[in-house]
Design a protein with these regions (language model features):
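Donor-binding/catalytic cores of nucleotide-activated saccharide
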Residues: 1-69, 74-89
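Residue-level recognition of alpha-helix termini/interfacial anchor residues
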Residues: 40, 111, 115-116
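Catalytic core of nucleotide-sugar-dependent glycosyltransferases
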Residues: 71-80, 85-112, 126-156
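Short, charged, amphipathic alpha-helical segments
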Residues: 114-121, 144
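Membrane-interface aromatic/basic loop that binds lipid-linked glycans or pyrophosphate carriers
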Residues: 136-184
Length: 184
């Protein structure tokens, strides 16, 4: 189901699904007005990977006017052996630091209460995506951090099943919890 409204411009309030899933959190396929970036002091995080997501999602929630372009303006190379996306084991926790910074930005702008459910659902989604795409032994290290503290810190653990948008993702989260209980 398409999340964007059939008219432009629009803003975050007119996106019909999780605002953090309506667009991918990379910046290279988006255009921004310089004045908007400067006015909102938008910056990339200084970390190896996931360094553009805070910029992108901050822009998304702060923008009063968003437009899309249907023309293909860029092509992306995939499966490049030494790319950052293929070597995330070296910076496996960067997504977590982005999620914490995003939550703080939302709070600083008085938006967290309005967007909290989308944020927590995205935090689960992005945590699981990172977990599912890492290799061992980093994958186990991430699972231990998620279950040991990060799911609590991100507000995921305190939520009932019906709070989550995606049943499959919630099921994977519960399976992860049950796996840990069974091992003890």
């Amino acid at each position: 189901e398409w999340a964007l409204p059939p008219y432009e411009p629009f803003n975050r309030r007119q996106i019909s699904t999780n605002i953090f899933r309506a667009f991918v959190g990379w910046a290279w396929d988006k255009l921004y007005l310089r004045e908007f970036v400067m006015k909102n002091d938008l910056k990339f995080q200084e970390q190896r990977t996931t360094n553009d997501a805070l910029f992108v999602f901050s822009a998304l929630v702060l923008a009063e006017r968003i437009c899309t372009v249907s023309e293909i303006l860029i092509h992306r190379r995939v499966d490049t052996r030494d790319s950052l996306s293929k070597t995330r084991e070296k910076s496996w926790d960067n997504f977590y630091h982005m999620l914490l910074a995003l939550r703080q930005m939302l709070k600083d702008h008085g938006l967290y209460t309005e967007i909290e459910k989308d944020y927590i659902n995205y935090a689960l989604h992005f945590s699981l995506w990172n977990y599912n795409t890492l290799a061992e032994p980093t994958k186990t290290k991430l699972r231990e951090k998620l279950l040991g503290e990060w799911y609590d810190e991100l507000g995921i653990s305190a939520r009932p099943e019906e709070y989550f948008y995606d049943e499959y993702e919630y099921g994977q989260y519960k399976d992860m919890l049950n796996f840990t209980v069974e091992k003890q």
